[in-house]
Swiss-Prot record:
Subunit structure: Part of the 50S ribosomal subunit. Forms a cluster with proteins L14 and L24e.
One Gene Ontology cellular component: cytosolic large ribosomal subunit
A molecular function (GO) term: rRNA binding
Name used for this protein in its record: Large ribosomal subunit protein uL3
Pfam families per UniProt: Ribosomal_L3 (PF00297)
Biological role: One of the primary rRNA binding proteins, it binds directly near the 3'-end of the 23S rRNA, where it nucleates assembly of the 50S subunit.
Keywords per UniProt: Ribonucleoprotein, Ribosomal protein, RNA-binding, rRNA-binding
Protein family: Belongs to the universal ribosomal protein uL3 family.
Parts forming coiled coils: none
GO biological process: translation
Disordered: annotated segments: 325-347
Length: 347
């Protein structure tokens, strides 16, 4: 008799497969970085194209021209509206205090509605001084930036996304000095990211609604003689007689897509400015294809060119951070030589 081998279909690692709580992805873990900089950035997914580049990675194709699919993420400057400080608590980090900038855009007030009406520059400077005293006294163990996006700069929408980003480095005083310098100012992607480095991409995937077990879990369609009433797109057995309940591990129909996902080690091929990519000192090229990116339009601001595909639909908020578990053989942290960028219509 042949060996019976029937591995389960689908991974249980992501159960329960339900919709994400928020369309703005969260980052729970930050990489260790010796450079004092904001650890990541955020933008909006525009679409995909492809390029030809000289491969600079170790391998058989090194030094040769290769085809590479890339995703374009538009990244208008982020605005640093606050500083959040953490102290060491009994169960981990606890928020010690926050300092918010006193002048916020009217669009931001659609999202943030807890700022006191009498909060002015004098109150802001007083709060900043109190936080500096806590840092000097050693009560603060970590300092992070509170930032918001500016989608109105690219004519996408008005209400921004609000998020928190860690700061690299080991010295808390250096982190605070960096945050104090950046609060109330704009941050561009070229200030915090390096061309050629590896990134982790965090986003909420495309939503597909309720789907059956064949598409959702990848189970086999039943042989026609085993089907019940001609229906074979279901599991043949929901489980044993005992225990007298259906186990949660049985693949069944339900929500598919709109899940919070992280994809590791995506290389940042290039960073462009104002919708254009500078190829050399004399030549630059617009990244927008003929007719614009489908369902998105024209790239007006800075953008990231990321290798391969990333989760999420067009116009969705995408967050990136430096790779938290890079491979041993990393590509060089520099832009590879790009010989061709496809600008043909994607319609």
């Amino acid at each position: 008799m042949g060996k019976i081998h029937r591995p389960r279909r689908g991974s249980l690692a992501y159960s329960p497969r339900k919709r994400a709580k928020s369309i703005v992805p969260r980052i729970r873990k930050w990489p260790k970085d010796s450079e004092v900089r904001m650890l990541g950035f955020a933008g909006y997914k525009a679409g995909m194209t492809h390029i030809l580049m000289i491969d600079d990675r170790p391998g058989l194709t090194k030094g040769k021209e290769i085809f590479m699919p890339v995703t374009v993420v538009e990244v208008p400057p982020l605005f640093v509206y606050g500083i959040r400080a953490y102290r060491q608590g009994y169960l981990g980090l606890e928020t010690a205090t926050e300092v918010w900038f006193h002048e916020l855009n009217d669009y931001v007030k659609r999202r943030i509605k807890t700022l006191p009406k009498d909060y002015n520059e004098e109150a802001f400077q007083a709060k900043l001084g109190q936080l500096e005293d806590l840092v000097n006294d050693g009560e603060i163990v970590d300092v992070r930036l509170l930032v918001h996006t500016q989608p109105w700069l690219i004519k996408l929408k008005k209400k921004p996304e609000v998020m928190e980003y860690a700061i690299g480095g080991d010295d808390v005083k250096a982190k605070f000095d960096y945050a104090k310098e950046k609060i109330g100012k704009e941050l561009r992607a070229s200030e915090v990211l390096h061309e050629g480095e590896l990134l982790d991409v965090i986003a909420v995937t495309k939503g597909k609604g309720t789907q059956g077990p064949v598409k959702r879990w990848g189970i086999k369609i039943q042989f026609h003689k085993a089907q019940r009433a001609g229906k074979g797109r279901h599991v043949g057995n929901l489980g044993p007689w005992h225990p007298t309940r259906v186990m949660w591990t049985v693949p069944q129909a339900g929500q598919m897509g709109f899940h919070h996902r992280t994809e590791f080690n995506k290389r940042l091929i290039a960073i462009g400015e104002n919708g254009k990519l500078k190829l050399d000192e004399k030549n630059e090229i617009e990244i927008t294809p003929k007719g614009g990116f489908p369902h998105y339009g024209i790239i007006r601001s800075d953008f990231l060119m990321i290798q391969g595909t990333i989760p999420g639909s067009f116009k969705r908020i995408i967050r990136v951070r430096p790779a938290i578990r890079p491979p041993k053989k990393k590509p060089p942290v520099e832009r590879p030589q790009i010989t061709y960028i496809s600008r043909e219509s994607k319609q």
